[in-house]
Amino acid sequence: MNRRTFLGITACATTAACAQGVREQNAPLSIRIRSEHQGRRVPRNFIGLSYELAQLSEPAFFSAQHNDLVALFRRLSPSGVLRLGGNTSEFCWFQATPETPAPKLHTPPGDLGQNWMPHRLFAIQPAAIDALAGFLDATGWTLIYGLNFGNSTPARAAAEAAYVQQKLGSRLNFFQIGNEPDLYQKASNGTRPPGWGFDDYVREWLAFADAVSARVPEARFGGPDTAASSDWVIRFGNEVAPKLGKRLVALSGHYYAEGPPNDPRVTTERLLAGNPAVAESARAIVRAADAHNLIYRMTEGNSCYRGGKPGMSDAFAASLWAADYLMTLASLGCAGINLHGGDSRFLSAGLGDHNPGLEVAGNNKPSAANGFYTPIATERGQVAGARPVYYGMLLAQEFAGATLLGLEPAQSGSLGAYGAERSGTVLLALVNKASFGDRDIHIMSDRSFSRATLWRLTGPGLDATTGVEFGRSAVSSEGAWNPRSEPLPVRNGALQIAVPAASAVLVFLS
């Protein structure tokens, strides 16, 4: 298992199918909805986005005046969660006044060409936090704010947290302290010396949390925000929760399905096949969170680490991956997910100014704008727009606030199936990840329905970077989206649905 697969929850779950490949012949399938088998309620703020904290070094980005970005956030979710963190958060500093001195830039030992961390500092001024407050008010979203742990001090973190809490108030969900600390001792990171480990992390983390709490008694925290170590997440809950009590509200970790982009083994076929071996880790984390009355949130991830792979992360394949992955996490009890993205300048800075996806792009380098995996294209000087992965998130958003229902069977090759009920309407998502082989689905239920409609998630091909639609409608740069329903005949309480290869449907039953 590589460092990005510990939360590889694209595996089968009780209400989802386990991908066994992406090439499957047409095989009729019967699915029964078990409405008496109710699961968890999907939180209304399940959907989220993750950005580099250094994006705040340009205060106009997250502001109420960034109209197209506000519109696309609101379209994606009326109550989503923005997470600010990433590698750049370890090199950001709060410039409270013009006289506030910058911290010393940490330079790790060894060859900087092999180091994947930023090599410069990013100043965050009060004006950026003020603008961020307006952005959150305009979108209806709340925030997870990442504090610099790798190259800062408890006193600096406390001063920054005090201003953030004062300005954001109830819009602030919790603070995270540090980003991917399980990688600190590696040469690619270099934030801590070799041999530094979990016990060192907890001791230092608690010093930061106590300093923040002394300045901000109402502060709440989440962690450990690891890259790959599920055991760190569980140990963090077990060891830190008793010390912090109600101040700790969430366990968090990251997940990237594939990577790096210049590895020839990273393919669309492998992305959509999923990784069933890691579902057990996800369930273990949820159990640990439940034991301490915490939530578990996947706070940073996407289809392929180190910026994404062209022709996969920026293509329709990512739409299907996102829809299936988000619904799988929901079915396993995850309280939310934040897919990473943003301006290519800050994504590249967060990788030590490396961008391996460009090697794959070759002469097609303009397609790298914003990073290949970003849900929303926001390159400087350009109008924002919804990328393919955004549409998969849009499908999953329909389940926000719904109560999950059991489905039988639990497995069906490359077809992912998810059911839920919201306000008397049953939702059924079917994601056909096969590259060829349409599926004919016979739907039955233990309750009667008289009306059925559906929206289809479609694209010209798995590698298509344009032409993606959900409900026969694209999302405009102004956030306009007008889905059109397709009626389905209901006969004796059952219905037939055709799900073409490389597509998904969302069915509404009432």
Please describe what each predicted stretch is.
Residues 119-120, 195-196, 272-273, 311-313:
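Short, contiguous strand/loop micro-motifs
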Residues 289-317:
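Active-site clefts of carbohydrate-active enzymes
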Residues 236-250, 254-256, 274-291:
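Catalytic-core regions of glycoside hydrolase
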